[in-house]
Amino acid sequence: MSNSNTTQETLEIMKESEKKLVEESVNKNKFISKTPSKEEIEKESEDTSLRQETQRRTSNHGHARKRAKSNSKLKLVRSLAVCEESSAPFVDGPLETQDIIQLHISCPSDKEEEKSTKDVSEKEDKDKNKEKVPRRMLSRDSSQEYTDSTGIDLHEFLVNTLKKNPRDRMMLLKLEQEILDFINDNNNQFKKFPQMTSYHRMLLHRVAAYFGMDHNVDQTGKAVIINKTSNTRIPEQRFSEHIKDEKNTEFQQRFILKRDDASMDRDDNQIRVPLQDGRRSKSIEEREEEYQRVRERIFARETGQNGYLNDIRGNREGLSRTSSSRQSSTDSELKSLEPRPWSSTDSDGSVRSMRPPVTKASSFSGISILTRGDSIGSSKGGSAGRISRPGMALGAPEVCNQVTSSQSVRGLLPCTAQQQQQQQQQLPALPPTPQQQPPLNNHMISQADDLSNPFGQMSLSRQGSTEAADPSSALFQPPLISQHPQQTSFIMASTGQPLPTSNYSTSSHAPPTQQVLPPQGYMQPPQQIQVSYYSPGQYPNSNQQYRPLSHPVAYSPQRGQQLPQPSQQPGLQPMMPNQQQAAYQGMIGVQQPQNQGLLSNQRSGMGGQMQGLVVQYTPLPSYQVPVGNDSQNVVQPPFQQPMLVPASQSVQGALPAGGVPVYYSMIPPAQQNGTSPSVGFLQPPGSEQYQMPQSPSPCSPPQMPQQYSGVSPSGPGVVVMQLNVPNGPQPPQNPSMVQWSHCKYYSMDQRGQKPGDLYSPESSPQANTQMSSSPVTSPTQSPAPSPVTSLSNVCTGLSPLPVLTQFPRPGGPAQGDGRYSLLGQPLQYNLSICPPLLHGQSAYSVHQGQSGLKHGNRSKRQALKSASTDLGTTDVVLGRVLEVTDLPEGITRTEADKLFTQLAMSGAKIQWLKDAQGLPGGGGGDNGGTAENGRHSDLAALYTIVAVFPSPLAAQNASLRLNNSVSRFKLRVAKKNYDLRILERASSQ
């Protein structure tokens, strides 16, 4: 009723205001038509006062309406007061004027009243609906409007507490159950809860208020007492319902989120998810391979600007893609034909590359992880199995496949990054027979102009060391494979081991030898000559037996024996004198067609010495590597054969072991003097000789015989491979004899020269020839007796092809290491390195100087002693003992001890050996030198000062650090073998 009254009063006020406006207009007209009189003036004043009063009331009523919208109760009270006051003044005044006004405004006012009535009624209905909604909720469940004494909304508080805190949730559910039981119990009007904490009392107070009960505490103030009241009621929703709702919403939200993630993945599938899926599906080996390719491409781009590398990765990647389809079809077959050492990590059907465990010791100082070379075969198309680690090398291997016109000649060639003058070469597809082979340049993809043709297809890499803490020469893995038509075969490659101090080095892990049996119609299997040598520190005291990675060879010849006939039963007879066989580390493989020979040398560590040599041959005669010369300074064979000679050596730092470097050298035609290609070990006397006659291949053109010579080493030595370069095709001769001989002295300088000045007169060979009266019959050709040449000294007068080069870092000369592979600049004959090896010494050093090979006599050796034995940019430390040289003149022993603090920090023990001859400057002394630990004031020049390091690696690092700095003394490799037991016993006294 109040709302309807208010509406009627408002309409009356509006009508009165309109009447006043009409009266004003009438009065104005009268005032204009008539002259004003006093009565009229008085009426006008009265009308003006009435109008002002009406406007004032109307404005007040307007404010009241605005306030009524916000608060209906206030609107009801004030609107009634305004209506009562405004009704009286409008009655005053003559009735005639009021009637006239009503006549004039009757029509428009009715329309306006209808409109205003509708608007006001709609607004009031909305207000009523707003008021009725909470009132209905209160009638159903008034608990949601309950607040406690502090004004907290109980419903919101309880719901949040139930959802958030699990402990409080249990407490609230318990209290709810107890209160419900109390409400349903008509016998009790109050309930006393046990004493509880203040927080739980607070929860109980709020739950009791939520149920509409009185809640107080007892006299102690720790127990809550609740009483039933008239407002006590049970809420419509139980506490557990809020928890279920929350769980359902959370579950739905999680489900929606998962669905959204899946949809996002589907949406982005076209852009980025293919990369992610590829990443997920790739194995670790494939990821490492991809990483190595990208890393090689990046570093090749950077170093190519500095003149070190020329990256032709387009050809390499193309070959990798084409070879992947061919390789995958025969991997399983090749794997079954591959005899290899057993390892506990191997599985019977595994064709994947095996990754070695990463030990903690191998993660420091650039020590490489050792990988079994025979387990690198990969089942993936383009993978060659490699190890990924920081500071690793540029030349990661790629798989290169070629197919000849008749049959497929397959080789797994590590395609490593080349130096500036050499580019990567792929194995060309060769014609069926050597006689029909066109010139070499027609089969090469790319070759530098200044490279000589015999080694144009040699894939070798060179890399310079960078600025690092202790950098040394980088290690390269250059494979050199000879592969020929009409044979289906795999050429082995070995695992490349980076030097420990190299900042980044080549780590080429190429597949091992995997040979496919020759076709049915062929009588001769492909020949392969493998020289395998091992560092004693590689796998210390390994009981793992060695098995060659090729076809079984016929026999193991003893000293001075001839090869048996081909009809002999194949078998393996390794000769290992008094030592344990070590797991193989590197191999040198030269595969040649139509014949097969295996020459393997296995080396294991016993006291850091090379103790034995395994020589294994096949019954078939070997096939020589012919090279010819068509021009004066460019060596070019009449028919070319690509060769891969992978090799690697590594010495673990904690083991006193010496590596066996390999050097590959070539003799020009004018300087051969009847010599033939040879492979030799530079070792002390007492070597054994193994002979293997060779006969030319029946299907090949006239050739020069080849010969391999070396020793059965008893200490660390150097492997020297030598090739003769004949002027042209030679008439067939009797097979040459492979003989292991000893090289007494081997010295070599390094100096850049022009290609025309490659071979100096000093490199003329000084070789002795001997006659062989035991010819060997070829399977298809009768023998013809002829002399067989052999070298008494392998390294006499050789013009070497350098396979190892050391690069100094910008800060100073870098230090070499006892890990050798076929390295360096094999395609340039102007750089060559080979260290001198003195009799009985356990370590050697390298001297850089003029290009060429010098066979020095006693006087030459004395002249070069100081220069060649001081640690230079290419020195190699193989032992733990270094001599201290270049001390200041006149320094006493006590003063010198103060200079050796840096050595002591490296763990070295200084030994003062009395020089028997009294030579100043740290003379060599002898093995019988006595260690004196007494501190005297005598001169240090009277002693030979020896620093004994805990490991060869520590000695290597110390020599790097001290020789490259402004130290007052230098370290060099010991000239002789010091008895470590005597030195250690002297240091312990």
Curated annotation (Swiss-Prot):
Compositionally skewed regions (Polar residues) per UniProt: 454-466, 493-517, 761-771
Biased composition (Basic residues): 58-71
Domain of life assignment: Eukaryota
Low complexity bias locations: 320-331, 416-428, 705-727, 772-790
Main location as per UniProt: nucleus
Keyword Nucleotidyltransferase assigned: no
Subcellular location as annotated: Nucleus
Keywords: Nucleus, Phosphoprotein
Domain SUZ intervals: 233-303
Residues annotated as domain R3H: 169-232
Record InterPro entries: R3H_dom, R3H_dom_sf, R3H_domain_containing, SUZ
Name by which UniProt lists this protein: R3H domain-containing protein 2
Species name: Bos taurus
